Amino acid sequence: MGKNASGKTSLLKLIENVYRILGSFQLEDELMSISGTQLEITFYHENRLFRYETELVRQNNLGKNLSFTQERIFVSDYFKSKSKLIFSPEIYTELKLKRELPDNISILFYILKERKNYAYYYDDLKDQDDMLHAAYDFYKNHGINKKYWKHILHLFDDNIMDLEEINSELFRLTYLDRSMDLSAKELLTMLSSGTIKGIALYTAAIQALQEGSGFIIDEIENHFHKTLVENLISMFKDKAVNKKGAVLIFSTHYCELLDLFGRNDNIWISKSEKQIILTNMYRDYSVRNDLLKSRKFYDDNFGTAVSYEMLMNLKRALMNE
């Protein structure tokens, strides 16, 4: 949660980049300009805790690829009795590893060994044509059951029976009473923007649930009815659905969504002053469990409300025009 320009998107992109490092042991510096960033990543693997430290540096000979410098890895056996000490340096012992890797490959390779996609980032800024192809790719090439695909289509348009990609240029859209072969451009005129984004969102969500992966969404409420957003959150909360422990990480301006959660320690407040700062609702604020979290936001207990004075300044400027 946080105001506009409070750093929420930057934080989610940082989380995505951490997942990329863990999953592929390398990282490209695209639009984030993260060269010079120092990272400390704590993670669990094969009954042990690891703390990884590095500084990301961009080198001209590596193109967009970042090099990993000043790398150190620390390890600790994991016991439930240590759960409150996970971020305490004193429980860790440094691993001495001989580095024999290219500069753009992290020494995490020696620990995790296999590449894996640990998280999906839902990007609704993509071209809608790209979103359609991406959604169908998730369905067809990542083992998503046909019945799940049809349920998703019905969820956003109950007249659609099926949607198939014939080739990279052609789709077959089947309604209750007819089928049509359409180019991607023609298909975009048949489906609403919300339907396309919803199909892409739910297909990626099911993929994350099936794999037990992370699923990252910036501004989860964008373009969707409140009920659909609540349904998506409930799928990740329900252990009967989320059998592999998939993790939903999202930002929102819609504070009523927070009332869906019984706990406070999974809610973070983002603020941007000289730097982006995250505070935890449970740890850093006094929040009574018997009060709606949304009410606390409306009362501006966390300093996240839109400035009334700024709104009035705009209104007065318009009145005086």
Pin down the residues of each PLM region.
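Switch/communication elements of ASCE P-loop NTPase nucleotide-binding domains
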Residues: 1-26, 179-308, 314
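Phosphate-coordinating catalytic segments in nucleotide- and nucleic-acid-processing enzymes
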Residues: 19-210, 298-308, 317-321
